[in-house]
């Protein structure tokens, strides 16, 4: 019978809860205001996320570590099934429809916990030596990062695949890989980047890069700038947030939600959200010193911290 380790209550990290709860609450309020249907879905996802957190918190994950490879390969199978059973939207197959419901499942999203756990499992079983992982171990770990990367990129969803790629290798960088390997990778990437851009990227992917680097903002970015300016210092009431209320601000529930955050809560509200994210990321990464030899926990907190940092940075920079 599985028993709950009572020590987890004495070592509970209250800082994470204090930082995560207001972020979730602000997100739920904003999405609900912008779109009631999506707000209801956001509430369901928040509840499911809380239950998943509670499950991971109470279960002795290390005693059940033998299940982690099984979960990883189940999720790989789901990624493979997208090509056969996937629902196509806007020219991409990224979702699986849940039978008898109106909900869809995005395997690339639910893959993330098993991805983190698999890296933690592998590194916990064979920690890095003093000078970092050598080429053989690095290649083995890279396989578990590159396999889902290529599957997700082929959907096509290069954005999610790239995030997974950065988190995976970013975690290895923090945990420890021999510096000669990183120098070699840097040279290969620097030389091959122009060829990849010219021959492998699709036109819309090139356009996104061009729009991001362009001095002249796109229509969507112009509308987000107007929304940010409309918010002022303290923000506007919901009915006075005209950019979102009259649908000028595109995709205000996801891509441009930070612009809506400032339109509603002003510069002060936007600064508060950024401050909460900054504290959460620094707190997670600072746990490296406290955990030290506990590689399972170190991999988990580093990967989660990197995920949060990348998504927060991308969403803010788009605005």
What kind of region is each of these model predictions?
Residues 76, 141-143, 147, 179-196:
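Hydrophobic alpha-helical membrane-interfacial segments at the cytosolic entry of transmembrane helices
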Residues 34-40, 139-171, 201-202, 262-270:
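Helix-loop-helix junctions and helix-breaking kinks within/between transmembrane helices
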């Amino acid at each position: 019978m599985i028993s709950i380790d009572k020590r987890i209550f004495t070592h509970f990290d209250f800082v994470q809860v204090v930082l995560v709860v207001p972020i979730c609450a602000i997100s739920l309020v904003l999405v609900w205001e912008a779109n009631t249907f999506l707000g209801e879905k956001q509430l369901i996802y928040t509840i499911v996320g809380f239950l998943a957190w509670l499950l991971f918190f109470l279960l002795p994950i290390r005693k059940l570590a033998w299940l982690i490879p099984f979960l990883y390969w189940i999720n790989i199978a789901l990624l493979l099934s997208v090509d056969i059973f996937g629902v196509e939207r806007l020219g991409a197959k990224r979702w699986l429809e849940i039978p008898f419901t109106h909900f869809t499942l995005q395997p690339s999203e639910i893959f993330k916990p098993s991805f983190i756990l698999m890296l933690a499992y592998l590194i916990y079983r064979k920690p890095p030596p003093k000078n970092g992982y050598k080429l053989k171990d690095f290649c083995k770990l890279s396989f578990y990062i590159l396999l889902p990367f290529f599957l997700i990129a082929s959907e096509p969803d290069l954005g999610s695949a790239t995030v997974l790629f950065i988190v995976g290798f970013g975690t290895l960088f923090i945990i420890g890989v021999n510096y000669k390997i990183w120098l070699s990778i840097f040279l290969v990437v620097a030389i091959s980047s122009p060829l990849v851009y010219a021959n492998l990227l699709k036109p819309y992917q090139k356009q996104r890069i061009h729009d991001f680097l362009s001095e002249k903002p796109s229509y969507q970015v112009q509308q987000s700038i107007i929304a940010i300016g409309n918010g002022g210092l303290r923000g506007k009431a919901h009915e006075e947030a005209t950019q979102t209320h009259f649908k000028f601000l595109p995709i205000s529930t996801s891509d441009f939600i930070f612009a809506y955050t400032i339109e509603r809560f002003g510069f002060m509200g936007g600064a508060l959200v950024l401050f909460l994210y900054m504290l959460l990321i620094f707190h997670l990464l600072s746990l490296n010193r406290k955990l030290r030899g506990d590689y399972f926990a170190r991999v988990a907190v580093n990967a989660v911290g990197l995920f949060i940092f990348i998504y927060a940075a991308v969403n803010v920079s788009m605005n």
